[in-house]
Amino acid sequence: MNKTKKPADRLIFHVDVNSAFLSWESARRMKEGLPDLRDIPACIGGDPAKRTGIVVAKSIPAKKCGVQTGEPVAMALRKCPNMVIVPSDFDLYVKCSRAFKKICASYTPVMESFSIDEVFLDMTGTSLLYPDPIAAAHEIKDRISDELGFTVNVGISTNKLLAKMASDFEKPNKVHTLFPEEIPAKMWPLPVRELLFLGKASEKKLTEAGIRTIGDLAHAWETDIQTLIGNKNGHQLYQYARGIDDSPVKAQPDEVKGFSAETTFNEDIVSIEQVDPILLAQCDIVAARMRRKKKKCTSVSITFRTLDFRNRSHQTKLPNATDITDEIYRCAKQLFRESWKGEPLRLIGVSVTGLTEDDFEQLSLFEDPEKKEKSRKLDAALDAIRQKYGNDKVTRASILNGAQGIARKAKAQMKNDAEN
């Protein structure tokens, strides 16, 4: 068997906000003299007055009462009747995410935004500025806590995999290392389910085969693992179990192959009158992104998640490439009506792919050129206003007149898109 690589010339940090949504709301409330949500039974998500929706995030005291992320608020309240419920605030999340990433970016020019609440930092070559990596990690952690009022974990290693595994060790407000020489003591005793990117289906197959720890996986024969869970997945997880990962920290994203927008809801979406404004807001977002990048799409797809967490999607090819919001919206509406059976929804998304340059357009005999030009001028006007005054400063009337809360979420999503 191959020995674990030790790429001593790399130094990678993974910075992860502890219970991000709950922490961000707590930081704001504490500035207002209110109790810290992290110290009391509390959750983010749902309508406090109606006691509806789902639990998006929970405090440790709420967790001790048996409250679980993703369960209905009504069920959580039966377990924890005195729990404080706070509705989601997407504007706040965007603001806090931007603030913590700004601090992280001040330590290295090579930062990869992995999600709204976590980043990778490539600290390779910073030894003159930060000769002690652990001290540098503590400095980042303490600055975020002191300046922003919430805590993070920082994982340190020689690659992204091990750095992220390290940041998931004891929480909150901790710095952990997981260097290759520490793998046998720190990582191999962990349950196999703790390995990054190992899903429930693979876990079930591995445990049934007697592979219960990450160490068991690392010391098995790779061909046996591939037989159990497939060649590609088996190879990757076998490498991960041995601490091998050569993926770079990407300061710039790969060439875009498509654009997408998704919205998760705390309450059930149950009517087409609620769905249409959501689809329009998302089509507005992806079309504006295409126009900024001077691209057009040739394919549109919609996706949605039901109350039992089942995902469904539907896709179609367009007769002509487009970047016009209204054309994408009409297509998305049709796709949704063809695939939705009326079951309650918790997530809706729109994506566009098959991108082409916007300097070529094939005309159709069946298109109304005047209507097309009118739509194009409307999009151009909205783009110009948003560029001058901010992405969140103008919203289509159909969105504002639609489902409650959709406009606010769409504006927050567009603001975040413009500033990243």
Regions found by a protein language model. Name each.
Residues 5-7, 194, 202-345, 417-419:
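DNA-contacting surface of Y-family translesion DNA polymerases
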